[in-house]
From Swiss-Prot:
It comes from the Eukaryota. The gene is GAL5. PANTHER family: BETA-DEFENSIN, GALLINACIN-1-RELATED. It holds the Pfam family Defensin_beta. This is Gallinacin-5.
């Protein structure tokens, strides 16, 4: 039973460290520096979210950006 508790704790630590699970909140200038743009409430179709510009604005960038 202790092994299950340990495995569960390790799993939670791994999920917290996963960079894709949370969006970085920043300034619009940070978004532009990353090659993105701010969009209110959602990103247009075919465009992915890469962060947050503010509470209601997402930082969006083309999936084909290199």
């Amino acid at each position: 039973m202790q092994i299950l508790t340990l495995l569960f704790a390790v799993l939670l630590l791994m999920l917290r460290a996963e960079p894709g699970l949370s969006l970085a909140r920043g300034l619009p200038q940070d978004c532009e520096r990353r090659g993105g743009f701010c969009s209110h409430k959602s990103c247009p179709p075919g465009i992915g979210r890469i962060g947050l510009c503010s509470k209601e604005d997402f930082c969006c960038r083309s999936r084909w950006y290199s």
